[in-house]
Amino acid sequence: MKTKGLALNSILIVISTSIIGTILHESAHYLAGVLLNLNPELHHNYVIPLTKGTELQIVLMAGAGPLFSLVFGCLILYISIKFVKPSLTKLFMTWLGMGSVLGLLGYLLIAPFAKDGDTGRIFSYLGIPTFISIVIAIASFIFISYLFRKWSSQFIFYKTEYHFDKKETQKQLFIYPIFASMVIMTFLSFPITAWVSLLPTIFMPMTYFSTYAKYKRMDNINPDLTINKVSSVLVVLTILTIIIFRYLV
């Protein structure tokens, strides 16, 4: 009998790590705003400077979130890959790290279309032409695809039941959580102040399909960790993160 334990845990992980990554990203904006005396106000997926600042101050605040996300994501992935044994903790850290890395590289993808987003504001301040931002977006897409294919090796440790069913496992590891993230995070993001705030929640999860595609082509996968029960810790963590996220609205 097929179980959905891996799928449910993966969905809980993706939702909770998406929220944690978003709050940390926005908190970096907030802290930068405080240091720049902009009297910022923290919300679930945006920060408002209540004090009118200079263009440079606004750009510095805008850049703080993506920069923090990249550094944080790389650190989490390094720790997970080097020191954490296969477990739900490792799977959690893998999703958290990859999602955080998208906090910069993913924003480069949408910069040509989101002029009011973090990278869009920075590009505008630096006077970067639209065609250059498109070139940067394409380069970012290629780099993300390379990294995410490389990190597919971090998903080979898990299976849904004693007898490894790769087709079912890859659905539970990737397909269910990717689409769940797109739908649930979009729903949790309302109300929105600008349409641009929905772009990351709708389009960035699609980058994980490169990880899925690489995993799908892998041969000789022999996972030894069966995940067929839902973690109560993940349930509580996901509920708490959703409460905090909605409180910040």
Regions flagged by a language model, labelled:
Residues 1-13, 169-172:
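N-terminal membrane topogenic signal
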Residues 5, 13-63, 67:
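Small-residue-rich helix-interface/hinge motifs
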Residues 15-17, 21, 226-249:
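Final/C-terminal transmembrane alpha-helix of multipass membrane proteins
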Residues 43, 53-154, 170-184, 205-212:
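Metalloprotease/metallohydrolase-associated module, dominated by Zn2+-dependent proteases
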Residues 58-59, 187-195:
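Membrane-interface helix caps and helix-loop-helix hairpins in membrane proteins
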Residues 110-115, 215-226:
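A cytosolic-side transmembrane-helix exit/cap motif
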Residues 153-173, 219-227:
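Membrane-interfacial, low-structure loops and terminal tails that flank and connect transmembrane helices
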Residues 195-207:
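Hydrophobic core segments of alpha-helical transmembrane domains in multi-pass membrane proteins
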